[in-house]
Design a protein with these regions (language model features):
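Interdomain "pre-motor" coupling segment immediately N-terminal to P-loop NTPase/helicase cores
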Residues: 2-69
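Short acidic (Asp/Glu) and glycine-rich catalytic loops that position anionic groups and cofactors
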Residues: 65-70, 94, 132-141
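Short, basic, glycine/proline-bearing loop/turn elements
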Residues: 71-73, 102
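N-terminal pre-P-loop "Q-motif" helix
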Residues: 75-94
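Walker A (P-loop) ATP-phosphate-binding motif of ABC ATPase nucleotide-binding domains
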Residues: 97
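Hydrophobic anchor at the beta1->P-loop junction of P-loop NTPases
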Residues: 100-102, 112
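Conserved glycine(s) of the Walker
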Residues: 105-107
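Conserved P-loop
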Residues: 110-167
Length: 167
């Protein structure tokens, strides 16, 4: 879960926050930020000092801490730091699996679909899946109607998200 990879650091060095803004995507060597801490790859940070803050990520490939930009994908903008981190992880070709968890309606599916469609040339297929738990573990075969009538209401939230992305 991405939430387990997010850490807020209060009273962080104002100088390092400024350097991170200046460095952009290039980043700053991890030892500069966390000299005595062992950190895991692709951890995300909210670094704060008073009213100043920056969203950051540890890139284990380049061994730098870099500023996380609020990406725009198909006109979809992150509304908060968690969505910015999620979209950053979803768009990072060095991260092969991203697990997003959270309450319904927080944008997980929309961000995942937008990121997948943005990168569609990198993949042969995009699979949309939903957990069967939402059906109270009922077998679809026992529901009345043909396969489209059975699956359509269940898949409608995915189609709704695709419609938002399309327009």
């Amino acid at each position: 879960s991405l939430n387990k990879c997010i850490e807020t650091k209060e009273d962080f060095s104002q100088e390092l926050i400024a350097k991170l803004y200046e460095s952009g995507e290039a980043g700053i060597p991890v030892e500069t930020f966390f000299p005595k801490e062992e950190i895991k790859g692709n951890n995300y940070y909210i670094l704060k000092n008073g009213s100043n803050s920056v969203l950051a990520c540890y890139d284990p490939v380049r061994k730098v801490v870099r500023k996380v930009e609020k990406l725009n994908t198909f006109g979809i903008y992150p509304k908060n730091s968690e969505q910015a981190f999620a979209l950053d992880a979803l768009m990072n070709p060095n991260i092969s699996l991203v697990a997003l968890s959270g309450k319904a309606g927080t944008g997980k599916t929309l961000l995942a679909l937008a990121a997948a469609l943005q990168q569609n040339k990198a993949f042969e297929q995009i699979y949309l899946a939903r957990p069967i738990v939402a059906l109270s573990n009922k077998d679809l075969g026992y529901l009345p109607g043909d396969v489209n009538e059975k699956v359509s209401p269940y898949m409608q939230p995915l189609f709704d998200n695709l419609a938002v992305i399309k327009h």
